[in-house]
A protein has these predicted regions:
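Glycine-rich phosphate-binding loops of nucleotide-dependent enzymes
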Residues: 1-200
Length: 200
């Protein structure tokens, strides 16, 4: 609902302290609400650099607040290089996206989302299909990003959620069954019974 894909039956949707019920999905993107979907948005025939550049051109606005250490951004290309460096993708810039490992494709999707200048980042199952090593790297990357902007994370990997979240809401069959801190969710019998049938 926060992205505008679904409309609420009642109540108010707030985005960065502003009511956005009346705004379209595109309008919310321009307000800085950027989504990364479980289904890849990468164009496989394009290089890593080209995919990120395309995302920059889609947004057509560069937010310096993403990378505070840089004083100025002279062009779209230089912004792409900043993102490549930030996400440790510089050595892969000329690689065709279809040849990347699953973990590197997830990083590229994240880079493309960041290239659109988000003020809030919505991530849908970013850990899907990752092995333990890839998940660990992505967790550390997202920890650094959450220092810059809020992240809304939809994820079934509870260990990743516990490593990243400040507040968790757990859904079961479309209903919120528990909400609170990591510690509260770990101890919740409702969550344990719904998902694992035992301790988290």
């Amino acid at each position: 609902m926060i992205s505008g894909e679904l409309k609420p039956d009642q109540g108010v949707v707030m985005l960065l302290d502003r009511r956005v019920n009346h705004l379209s999905e595109i309008a919310r993107v321009h307000r800085g609400c950027i989504r990364s979907f479980q289904v890849s948005s990468i164009i496989g025939s394009m290089t890593v650099f080209e995919n990120i550049l395309l995302a920059v051109k889609q947004k057509r606005s560069i937010l310096k607040m993403l990378f505070r250490k840089f004083q100025s951004i002279s062009s779209e290309s230089s912004f792409v290089y900043q993102i490549l460096n930030q996400l440790s993708l510089k050595t892969m810039e000329t690689k065709v996206a279809s040849t990347l490992s699953h973990g590197d494709k997830r990083k590229l999707e994240l880079a493309m989302a960041l290239a659109m200048g988000p003020k809030i980042l919505l991530l849908d199952e970013p850990f899907a299909g990752l092995d333990q090593a890839e998940s660990s790297k992505l967790i550390e990357l997202l920890k650094s990003i959450k220092k810059i902007m809020p992240i809304f994370l939809i994820e079934h990997d509870m260990q990743a959620v516990f490593a990243l979240a400040d507040k968790i809401s757990v859904l079961n069959e479309g209903e919120i069954i528990e909400s609170g801190s990591v510690e509260k969710i770990r101890k919740s019998k409702l969550v344990q019974n719904a998902y694992l049938g035992g301790d988290l």
